[in-house]
A protein has these predicted regions:
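Acyl-CoA/ACP chain-elongation machinery
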Residues: 1-7, 144
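Short, glycine/acidic-enriched loop or turn micro-motifs at the edges of active sites
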Residues: 14
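C-terminal nucleotide
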Residues: 17-169
């Protein structure tokens, strides 16, 4: 309802609540958030545009919402949950076999992993561990590419080029 189409809220939330030199740690269910200081101390950040088309009305977002809902429904056959984000990685490992749809399984694996990566990223930022934060961002990209399937060839090429510059596999 914020943007007039089915979409997430993060872009709009960041525009409304962002603060210089801070990351936003947002609970999309409750809209509770925390501003986490980001200390880059000599680190250069490159922001670029892939010029990839992005269409909120293409149905892909809604497909992923439905796939995640299917995963929740199937998990509910063995453990009651409302959201995938409720599951820790250990919890997910215990219930993942209930997800019989392979696509829904990959989407759920991404969501559960991304929630943990986000928690770990907040801790890394609070501790000033920018190397750990970068590793988590790289893991996030791989999961978005392989499990959530939303990156695209242009973004993948940029990530791979960056990884080569800093000697990552």
């Amino acid at each position: 309802e914020f943007a007039g189409v089915m979409c997430g809220i993060m872009d709009q939330f960041a525009s409304a609540h962002g603060k210089v030199d801070h990351a936003i740690y947002l609970n999309c269910d409750t809209l509770e958030y925390d501003l986490v200081p980001v200390k880059l101390d000599g680190i250069k950040v490159v922001v670029t545009n892939t010029h990839s088309p992005h269409k909120l009305d293409s149905g892909s977002f809604n497909d992923r919402v439905r796939q995640c809902q299917l995963a929740v429904e199937q998990i509910n056959s063995v453990r009651p949950i409302q959201y995938l984000a409720e599951l820790s990685q250990v919890d997910f490992d215990q219930v993942k076999d209930a997800i019989t749809d392979e696509t829904a399984h990959r989407r759920a694996r991404h969501v559960v992993g991304e929630v943990q990566r986000t928690k770990d990223a907040v801790e890394a930022l609070k501790n000033g561990d920018i190397v750990k934060f970068g590793q988590l961002m790289n893991q996030s990209h791989v999961s978005l590419r392989d499990d959530y399937e939303v990156t695209g060839p242009q973004l993948d090429a940029l990530a791979e080029a960056a990884w080569k510059i800093i000697n990552l596999p």
